[in-house]
Regions:
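Metal-dependent nuclease catalytic cores that hydrolyze phosphodiester bonds in DNA/RNA
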Residues: 1-123
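Cys/His-rich finger/ribbon microdomains and the adjacent scaffold used
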Residues: 10, 182-209, 213-289, 316-318
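Accessory interdomain/linker segments of ATP-dependent helicases and helicase-like nucleic-acid enzymes
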Residues: 25, 29-66, 76, 517-577
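Conserved DEDDh/DEDDy metal-dependent 3′-5′ exonuclease domain
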Residues: 75, 90, 94-105, 109-120, ...
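Acidic, Mg2+-coordinating catalytic module of metal-dependent nucleases/exonucleases
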Residues: 165-227, 238, 247, 443, ...
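Long, highly charged low-complexity segments
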Residues: 247-333, 384, 542, 555-577
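RNase H-like, metal-dependent nuclease domains and their acidic two-metal-ion catalytic environment used
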Residues: 309-314, 319, 323-335, 340-341, ...
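Metal-dependent catalytic core segments for phosphate chemistry
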Residues: 316-377, 420
Length: 577
């Protein structure tokens, strides 16, 4: 049998999902065949962005006038151990920076992005500290720190001195430093249990965050479907699996058979009933006609309420309504992302908001300045449209568009008070919240693309969902191909049209017992004057007292808005539990 190799990345994977490491070992031993990579172009995009970040870090070291040793690449014909032997001891040469240094130490192997030569100013003692370049922007992740711990341990074995510090060069450009002794005990604890990492003990796949980036996602997905795993029921959470399994409920079929009034230790009775109802709907969807939309049922309102909690969030349709969707590139630059398309659907009109045809609008932003301009113009457009038609609303699916617009308005310092007024007076309507609190549907996911079939919506453009839009935009950045932008716009137009179709379908299902949500709440304050004051102060330019004062104006309104959003999110979580 081929000897199993341990790497820092394997230990990181093991922390996230034991089964992922089991499958990796099975792949290396030939027990399972290579798996088609599920993320394809997007995974390559991320890898390329990582290499770009490394190259930028390397260039920065050179720009500082430091002597840099680039380790020759590993030859195809040599093993990792032979590569390490060929590299020898690069520390003896006294370079300030060593790039891509391979280590093999105590059964673990890995390659450090950078190793820095450090001289103690008081004693003159020389030591070496590892630096890893990561696309993460805000702080180190546990796996990143563990990799650095291995490099530090390997450096100590070669030089006799444990690095006092380890470093991460984040995608944001920040240089995060970690005291080695603060984290090394945990690394050594993990290493002491490495036998369990290398064992052939049976593991079971459990859904976790690692699934989103795992090379073996399709392997586990096939197994779960073959087993009819209970977590395929929409709304079943990881914390529900243990009590369900303890009660012998391990499949969708078994959960669907749970009768009303049943009790299960560790699960709220109302929640158990809701999960069982969801499983029953999904089972019915499997046995129904292939082209038929999935079955659904309205959720009965709690005692004392006249109508569904979901439908109570739905306002009466208006000719001024707008349907909104954004597309963004999270890794546009290592230092930050970019929202490059702001798309919406509305009725064009001559001023009164009535009678026009539904038209799709696409506004592009190819740099941060343009992003700020589009955000400001969009907020002004929505505010002006709502002034003319107070009954209009901005519909979106999931909270992303509203929360993104709030974040971008703060980031660019544009339209914050106007947006606060729109949010505070209920202009934004999240259709996912309406559906989640108002009905159950026989689908595994409540994403837009799974629910638009209820309205009979048929898509025209499919570019692999959101990640596909990112890849297509990357193609545009590489070659300026207009066709890439056209495909993204067609995809985005599908999203807003599907959102409108779903809204119209919800209105058709509405019972007269449900009340329309109030169209508008009268704000206590008019933001126009304050907005003008802010603009006048901003004109003094960054760094001035006036510019700082502009940022402070409206502070309490923004804080109150954020407080309300947090409270509503918690309330929705309780209602959905």
């Amino acid at each position: 049998m081929t000897a199993r190799l341990l790497t820092p990345s394997k230990i990181t994977a093991w922390l996230s999902c034991e089964h992922a490491l089991t499958l990796q070992h099975q792949l290396e031993s030939g027990a399972i065949a290579p798996v088609a990579q599920p993320f394809g172009s997007f995974a390559r995009l991320l890898a390329n962005k990582g290499l770009e970040h490394e190259a930028a870090c390397l260039a920065a070291y050179r720009a500082q006038g430091l002597s840099v040793l680039e380790i020759p690449d590993r030859k195809r014909s040599e093993t990792f151990a032979e590569w390490v032997e060929r590299v020898g001891d690069p520390f003896a040469e006294g370079h300030d920076v060593i790039y891509q240094l391979p280590f093999a130490h105590d059964g673990v192997r890995g390659v450090a992005d950078f190793v820095l030569r450090v001289v103690d100013e008081e004693t003159g003692q020389v030591s070496y500290e590892p630096v890893d370049a990561k696309l993460a922007r805000s702080e180190a992740k546990p796996g990143h720190v563990l990799q650095l711990c291995f490099y530090a341990e390997a450096i100590e074995a070669l030089t006799g001195t444990l690095p006092a510090q380890m470093h991460l060069w984040l995608g944001s450009g920040e240089f995060e430093t970690i005291r080695t002794n603060d984290v090394m005990p945990y690394w050594r604890h993990l290493r002491s249990g490495s036998n369990s990492l290398m064992s052939e003990a049976e593991t079971t796949p459990i859904p976790c965050d690692h699934c989103e980036i795992c090379d073996f996602a399709s392997v586990c997905e096939d197994r779960w479907r073959a087993e009819d795993a209970v977590h395929l029921v929409a709304g079943v959470r990881t914390v529900d699996l243990a009590p369900l399994e303890a009660a012998g409920i391990e499949t969708v079929e078994a959960l669907a058979e749970v009768s009303p009034g049943s009790e299960l230790e560790g699960v709220d009775p109302d929640r158990l009933l809701r999960m069982a109802s969801q499983a029953e709907l999904q089972r019915a969807a499997r046995t129904g006609p292939g082209e038929a939309p999935p079955p659904f049922r309205l959720i009965e309102p709690p005692d004392g309420l006249p109508g569904s909690l979901g439908y109570e969030q739905l306002p009466e349709p208006d000719d001024g309504d707008v349907f909104l969707d954004f597309e963004g590139h999270p890794f546009w630059r290592p230092s930050g992302g970019l929202f490059f398309l702001f798309g919406w659907l509305c009725r064009d009109d001559a001023g009164d908001g009535a009678g026009g045809a539904w038209t799709y609008h696409a506004r592009w932003a190819h740099d941060l300045d343009e992003e700020g301009e589009q955000v400001g113009e969009l907020i002004e457009y929505l505010a002006e449209r709502r002034r003319r038609r107070p009954g209009m609303h901005v519909y979106h699916y999931n909270h992303t568009e509203r929360s993104t617009l709030e974040r971008l308005a703060r980031q660019h310092g544009v339209g914050e008070l106007l947006l606060d007024e729109l949010v505070g007076t209920g202009a934004f309507v999240d259709l996912l919240a309406v559906i989640r609190d108002g009905m159950q549907v026989g689908v595994e996911s409540y994403g837009l693309k799974h629910l638009e079939v209820l309205a009979g919506y048929q898509r025209g453009e499919d570019i692999g969902q959101g990640a596909g839009a990112v890849v297509a935009y990357e193609e545009f950045m590489a070659n300026g191909d207009q066709d890439s932008l056209d495909r993204i716009a067609d995809y985005n137009a599908d999203d807003v049209r599907a959102t409108r179709a779903l809204r119209d379908w919800l209105v058709e299902q509405r019972d007269d017992a449900h009340h329309w949500r109030d169209a508008e709440l009268d704000p206590d304050e008019q933001p126009e004057e304050l907005e003008a004051r802010v603009a006048a102060l901003k004109a003094f330019g960054p760094g001035t007292d006036e510019h700082l004062l502009a940022d402070l104006l409206g502070y309490w309104q923004r804080e109150w808005s954020a407080h309300k959003v947090q409270r509503m999110s918690r309330l929705m979580g309780l209602l959905g539990s």
